[in-house]
Structures are given as C-alpha cells and as structure tokens.
Amino acid sequence: MKALVGRFTVVAFLLLAFSASPRVRAEAPAEKPFGLPFADPPGPGTWLLGQTYGNTTGAYRQRRTTYNAGQGVHFGIDLSAACGTPIVAIGDGVVSKVDALSHGSAPHNLMIDHPNGYASFYGHLLERPRLTVGQPVTRGEVVAKVGDPDLTCTSRPHLHLEIRDAEEYRHLYNPVLFIEADWDSLALVGSFGRGFERDLDNPRRWQFLDDQPEVALWGGVLNEYARPWPPDWSGR
C-alpha cells in the first residue's frame, strides 16, 4: 500500500511540475506553412540569403547594442536583393500594421497576421506599403518592395523578414522552421553573416540553421560567453 501511495505521489508531482512549467519553446509545425517572400528563384540577379536567423557572429558582436532587445541574436533572416524588388506575402493573412517603426527595420515596414497564430514582419522597405490595416492579402501577392536601411540602395539593400506570434508580437521564431525552401543550398552563397558564434564551453549548441533559440523581446541576452569563438576582441 505504501509503495502504491508513493507511486501516486511521484506521478502527481510530475504532473504538477510539467503543468507549472512555462512553455519556453513553440512546437515547429509538422508541415511548413509559409512560402518564400519572392516570386523569382534565388540567384545573383534576383536575391540571395544574406544573414540567417539566430546566434550569428554578426549579431554576437552587437549583442549588447543593436541586438540587445532580441536577446543578443539575429531574430529574423536577411535576404539580399536590389532596391525595388517586389516582395510577396508568405501566406494568406490580414494586414495588422503598416510603418510601425516601434518594431524597428526602418525606413518602412509591414506586419501581416496569419490565421495559424503567427505573424510575418517585412522590414527595410523602399516605400510605405500601399496597404491598409485590416486589408486581406493572399500568399504570393505583392505587398512591398525591397529597400535599404541606409537609404542609398547601394550599401546593403535587403529584406529583413521575421516570424512572430500574432498576439503580442513579442516572441520571434526561426523562419527556417516555417518557410518551405532549400535552406542548406541557400546558405552556401551570398551570406554576409559569417556563420554562427560558438560557445567553447558548449560547442555544439546553436551551430545549425534549424537549431537556433526562440527570442522573447527584452528577455535578457542569451549568448554571453566566457570563451567565445571567434573571439570578441571588441568587448561590446
């Protein structure tokens, strides 16, 4: 009898522990629900993957400055393309924000809410999108144009694309897990992110395209390493 009571106690404790634990990581969808934000295939004359999502070396160097709000990681993907390149909606949805610069990615941006509970965010646009809040859009519909955060169209024109939760827009997810594409091939050329920063005390963590941390805005820097590689000579 005592053994039986003990087993029930252990089971009850485990159930309570799991129910009380916050949900830190969202489940990646079994089938990727979104498409790429360009109608044309990738290539030198169309677009290339510039910087991936996650613990990139570029974000690590700026973890306490530019990427401090995003827990020290690059919380979207950058797709290099010429200014004016048409951007298409990655899925059916409804426009929720236009030029909401509190979300960053100037000079112009766009947020689309999708019925599956996620939102797509398009940043560094050439001009204010000609859409209105509440307007429905369909997957593949042109919604914006690629711009340049430096306003030159020669320094670093690119689309910054994010996947967020559509409720608070505070949680950001790895687009690689949500967008159907040959990411391994895309990562072979065009990258300006120089790969992922490595923690020599945990060298295998966050070293692959599909193994990167989710982000909670203003949740505290995730990648303060005692032994980083490459070394952080700047100390920023």
Predicted regions and their residues:
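Bacterial N-terminal signal peptides that target proteins for export
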Residues: 1-9
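Bacterial N-terminal signal peptides
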Residues: 9-17
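Surface-exposed, glycine-biased beta-strand/turn segments
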Residues: 22-108, 139, 148, 188-236
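Short amphipathic beta-strand/extended segments with alternating polar/hydrophobic composition
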Residues: 50-52, 61-63, 122-125, 172-182
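Short alpha-helix capping/helix-loop boundary micro-motifs
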Residues: 80-81, 128-131
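Zn2+-dependent peptidoglycan hydrolase active-site motif and core
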Residues: 90-129, 156-160
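Conserved, short, structured surface segments that act as functional micro-motifs
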Residues: 110-114, 135-206
